[in-house]
Design a protein with these regions (language model features):
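Conserved AdoMet/S-adenosylmethionine-binding subsite of the radical SAM
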Residues: 1-123
């Protein structure tokens, strides 16, 4: 990805009429990968941080919350266990949370409704 990253950022800037979603599980590398004129983000870019379990949420989300990103969202997919993100949502910087299960014949975890109901109530 490094060899074409600058080209992609230029395209995103040029196409301000489109909204771009960037999904990453490597949020700790974010500052290494943004363009010089990023400031606190582009108006047409939302960054999604993935967290599949509580351990990763507690590692990635504090980093994510502190980054200069205008539009922030979380993806729990595959959501492998119940995840408590209440303290991260209380910051007011997370605009959306998406939850999804694991797919395929070899899936290790079946998403239980209780996993996402708790997150739903935190958001309300």
């Amino acid at each position: 990805a490094d060899q074409w990253r600058e080209e992609v950022w230029n395209f995103i800037k040029i196409r301000s009429d489109l909204n771009f979603i960037i999904i990453t599980k490597r949020i700790h590398r974010f500052l290494e990968c943004i363009p010089e004129d990023w400031n606190n983000g582009y108006n047409n870019v939302t960054i999604y941080c993935t967290c599949e379990n509580q351990k990763m949420a507690d590692y990635r989300l504090p980093i994510f919350i502190d980054l200069p990103i205008k539009y922030k969202a979380i993806i729990h997919e595959p959501m492998l266990e119940e995840i408590n993100i209440e303290k991260y949502l209380q910051t007011g910087v997370i605009e959306q949370v998406i939850c999804g299960g694991e797919s395929g014949e070899d899936k290790k975890c079946i998403l239980k409704p209780s996993f996402y109901f708790k997150i739903h109530f935190f958001i309300l």
